[in-house]
Amino acid sequence: MKRIYFLIFLQLGLMNAQDLPVAKWENINYAGDNEVYHTMDIYLPDQGSKIFPLVLTIYGSAWRANDKKGSNYIKKSLIQPLLNSGFAVASINHRSSTDAIFPAQIHDVKAAIRFIRANAKQYQLDNSFIGITGSSSGGHLSAMAGTTSFNKEMEGEVGSHLEFESHVDAVVDWFGPTDFLIMDLCGSKMVHDDVKSPESRLIGGAIQNNKAKARAANPITYINDKTPPFLIIHGMVDLTVPYCQSKTFKMALDSAKVESRLISIKDGAHGKNVFKKEIQEEMVSFFKDNSK
């Protein structure tokens, strides 16, 4: 009987794996250094040999992981809905906070975008539209890519395509931190001000003792009139990245007259009850509207 249950479990696991999207190109190094944290996978819709608008996806890991671009979680929650709607997807790795402190992570993201623009034809990509999305720490880096679009001081020097632009055309931020310095003011199950918090580890010191570094890592710092449209999605009972992070960010975007929308999910926690089909469809519609 135990063997029968095991075989059924194994078969179901294989069926689920078969349902997940498969990258057309895997482990492309966008920095030319053979490091796993500088690789990406590119997925194409099953729609022939035409070129496709692109969305980058960034996994959430509290900035602690450097090789989760192919996780089942990101495939199900972000990659599959985008592919189903005709978008190509580049799922990227980046340096973790143990590999290097900020701004290394956003430098990696921008290097990946420049690589895509430089090599779009080879990978059937229409680089006239590049969107970006991610959840949690991946939402933070997606938001950073958006608010620092056209900001030369945040480019870094990763890779060999520095002559290409790294701006993005639209951002979907799934519950990403946007202002580290106020995270403990609005409810959380962790102490973000602690020296061992993910945010403190990212900048290399306790955030309240390193306020300049914290502000430099905050997407909200860089909002300006060149900031692209934003769709922000956040659960209202998120106790890891408090809901106030997105609410405050939305207010700042409004003040700068940046096109934006906040979807607040009443029963949404940190990822739980957030990636609903209807919310994934909102993401897709947002990218479609901005890629026309």
What do the PLM-derived regions correspond to, one by one?
Residues 18-50, 101:
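N-terminal cap/lid segment of alpha/beta-hydrolase-fold proteins
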Residues 100-121:
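Alpha/beta-hydrolase active-site loop
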Residues 114-187:
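Primarily recognizes the serine-hydrolase "nucleophile elbow" in alpha/beta-hydrolase
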Residues 69-90:
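Short amphipathic alpha-helix adjacent to the substrate-entry channel of hydrolases
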Residues 268-277:
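Catalytic histidine-centered segment of alpha/beta-hydrolase-like enzymes
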Residues 231-234, 238:
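Short beta-strand/loop motif that positions the catalytic acidic residue
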